[in-house]
Amino acid sequence: MSKPIDPQSAVEAMWKTAPRLAKAKAERVYMEEYRKSLKAILMKASGKSSAAAQETEAYSHPDYIKHLAGLQAAVEAEETLRWQMVATEAAIEVWRSQEASNRRIDRAAA
């Protein structure tokens, strides 16, 4: 049998996770937005005349590829924290359901 759910601990875990989740989301959004700026910077620096050639050069540039790896890490960090939050919320809902069932059993026994 699994250990009982402690709703107070779950809420405390949510309070501790929330700032980290917010920071991770901010980092992910920044990385997504900066990707556009980086592409423009690299296109301009490519020295190519056509937009297609500039874009190809920018997308294959090591700085752009490195940025994508950073974006990947930012998304992973955010999603990990988000799913921890979802799991904690689900645990609280399970506890609420168990408590409601216990109240029904108590009323039926009375």
Which residue stretches match the model-derived regions?
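Extended alpha-helical coiled-coil "stalk/arm" regions
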Residues: 28-58
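Short, glycine/alanine-rich amphipathic alpha-helical segment
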Residues: 48-77
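N-terminal cationic amphipathic segment used for targeting or macromolecule association
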Residues: 8, 50-51, 56, 106-108
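Short A/G/S/P-biased low-complexity tracts
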Residues: 9-12, 61, 98-105
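Long amphipathic alpha-helical coiled-coil segments
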Residues: 25-28, 32, 36-37, 69-102
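Short intrinsically disordered terminal tails
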Residues: 1-2, 107-110
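Short, charge-rich amphipathic alpha-helices with coiled-coil/heptad character
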Residues: 1-19
